[in-house]
Regions:
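Active-site-proximal "nucleotidyltransferase
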Residues: 1-135, 153-169
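Short beta-strand scaffold segments in enzyme catalytic cores
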Residues: 139-142
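Short, intrinsically disordered, charge-balanced linker/junction segments flanking boundaries
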Residues: 173-178
Length: 178
């Protein structure tokens, strides 16, 4: 609601986002659980896209977040990990979650919590399988007001998300997503 109160169109985003993220730095730092850092402008970690026609906002961490947060202890806070393709309908009185992508996850040894020693400590002698995380392209399918929609984790209306819609009908998607 903090963002969509003032920014509801692509034009608003273009004209207002730079000043908005500076004006609301303290609120954004708190929202992203980064109060323990000296990060001056946490708004640079947050990206979003707007689908004006459907009244949707898609939230995602930015490339800058990906590059900077590995070097900050506790930088990948839980809200930032979950802010990976979150889609809200902002036409409702309180923004309503429509879809959420996969939570951010990491390669083995990419963060201290994902070292093999940390995994052994966490899981003990229980057997677990660790696989390499391959880079790829995430398409997020979701139903909104009876319509099958698709996006990437950071943008509406991309070529790949439009092409992805040709793979399913709303009925088929509903059938396999149950």
């Amino acid at each position: 609601n903090l963002i969509t109160r003032d920014i509801r169109t692509q034009r608003d985003k273009k004209e207002k986002w730079a000043s908005f993220k500076h004006e609301h730095a303290t609120e954004l730092r708190s929202l992203l659980e980064l109060d323990h850092t000296d990060m001056k402008n946490p708004g640079t970690l947050l990206g979003f896209d707007i689908d004006e026609e459907r009244g949707l906002i898609l939230l995602n961490y930015t490339g800058q977040a990906h590059n900077e947060l590995h070097d900050i202890e506790g930088g990948w806070s839980q809200p930032l990990r979950e802010m990976r393709g979150l889609i809200y309908d902002f036409t409702t009185e309180v923004p309503t979650l429509v879809s959420r992508g996969f939570q951010k996850f990491f390669n083995a040894n990419e963060l201290p919590e994902n070292t093999y020693d940390a995994l052994r400590e966490k899981y003990g002698d229980r057997e677990y399988v660790a696989r390499e995380k391959a880079d790829g392209h995430m398409i997020e399918y979701f139903m909104h007001r009876g319509e099958l929609c698709a996006s990437t984790r950071g943008k509406f209306g991309t070529t790949s998300s439009i092409e992805a819609l040709s793979m399913f009908t709303a009925d088929k998607f509903s059938e396999i997503s149950e």
